[in-house]
Amino acid sequence: MRILADKNIPHIFKLFGLHNTVTICEGRGISAKDVRDIDILIVRSVTKVNKLLLDDSSVKFVGTATAGVDHIDQNYLKKYGINFVYAPGNNAVAVVEYVFSALLWLAQRGRFFLRDKIVGIVGVGHIGSLLNERLRNFGIHTLLCDPPLEKINSSKPWKSFETLVAEADILTFHTPLIYYGDYPTWHMVDIDVLEALPSNRILINTCRGSVIDNNALLKVLENGKKLNVILDVWETEPELSLPLLSYADIGTPHIAGYSTESKTRSILQIYNAYCNFFNIFNVINLSALDSPVIYYLRVQKEIDETLLHKLVKFVYNIQYDDVILRRFAAKSGGFDKIRKHYLARREWSSLRVETYIDSNNEILTKLGFNVCCV
């Protein structure tokens, strides 16, 4: 079979190259001509998969190595019997650790304690639920908002979005991008929400850029409103508002989910679906794709926020990604070039922590570190 894949997806040849003809290319440049004679298409969020791309093609199977699917016309795929698979939840650990890293950095810079703050989580799917779990495991109070889930399961202590805007010190968004229907998320944070938001709040967006009206956000910041802003996603990507970037406390190029481990989990999910769909025996030794522990530390004092921040920075320094974006954002194609050449970070599980303190063992294990009691 003939496979076309985004060149920035790892392990493509190792997984699919044994009995197939595999071609890789830039995801944003994939055209109808490229897929005309292709059987299998594997993409990321930068490729729009729709009628314009797939009409007159021989594509039978589409996989996207992403949790979001707003770049995929699923109705079209269903209409023409094209099998589709995506990778929900596989980037959850990476995104949660990105958010936690950003919050720890802000807390250290602002000299406040996260345990004194209330975190409002908007969207409590794979990512939001894991973030809630980890924050609570570290003693941080959370408020949850997810109207579609509340409709299905009313037993949780759900809060309205208006309550989060009024009461949460920190708002972090983990929703899909939905334009219509009962629960649209497009411009969920508009000028009215931003003006109602108390000063000195923290806004974090790692889901889709258009969940926050970027022009409205820039307007209130230019008018002097004091907000801390962490943006990994932007409206009109790969272009972004340079003035808005100048106001952001942390700005990164849509890489919150870009860990080595998350990329491997995502493509493995697509590979397994491919094997099932085409009735192919899975001969891959999955252990060959495992990412080994690469850092070792011994901790001899009880974990607090300052020490946790040091451990996190040992694995991933979020300031580095912020500096890189600011350096190249104004250059032609800079946003995509950073993503293309991004040195995928490791997750906290890559850090082997040795400690003789029982409470450290419990806390660090729940936060996702690789812990060994000594």
Curated annotation (Swiss-Prot):
Q: Which InterPro entries match?
A: D-isomer_2_OHA_DH_cat_dom (IPR006139), D-isomer_DH_CS (IPR029753), D-isomer_DH_CS1 (IPR029752), D-isomer_DH_NAD-bd (IPR006140), Erythronate-4-P_DHase (IPR020921), Erythronate-4-P_DHase_dimer (IPR024531), NAD(P)-bd_dom_sf (IPR036291), PdxB_dimer_sf (IPR038251)
Q: What is its EC number?
A: 1.1.1.290
Give the residues annotated as active site. 208, 237, 254 (proton donor)
Keywords associated with the record: Cytoplasm, NAD, Oxidoreductase, Pyridoxine biosynthesis
- Domain of life, per UniProt, equals Bacteria
GO process annotations (BP): 'de novo' pyridoxal 5'-phosphate biosynthetic process; pyridoxine biosynthetic process
The coiled-coil segments of this chain are none
Record keywords: Cell cycle included?
no
Reactions catalysed, semicolon-separated, are: 4-phospho-D-erythronate + NAD(+) = (R)-3-hydroxy-2-oxo-4-phosphooxybutanoate + NADH + H(+)
- One function term, GO molecular function aspect: 4-phosphoerythronate dehydrogenase activity
Among its keywords, does the record have Ribonucleoprotein? no
Binding positions for NAD(+) per the UniProt entry: 146, 175, 232, 257
Which compartments is it annotated to reside in?
Cytoplasm
Q: Where along this sequence does the record place binding of substrate?
A: 45, 66, 258
Q: In which pathway does it act?
A: Cofactor biosynthesis; pyridoxine 5'-phosphate biosynthesis; pyridoxine 5'-phosphate from D-erythrose 4-phosphate: step 2/5
Instruction: Tell me which GO cellular component terms the UniProt record holds.
Output: cytosol
Q: Family per UniProt?
A: Belongs to the D-isomer specific 2-hydroxyacid dehydrogenase family. PdxB subfamily.
| Assembly with partners or alone | Homodimer.
Purpose: Catalyzes the oxidation of erythronate-4-phosphate to 3-hydroxy-2-oxo-4-phosphonooxybutanoate.
Q: Which HAMAP family match?
A: PdxB
Q: What is this protein called?
A: Erythronate-4-phosphate dehydrogenase
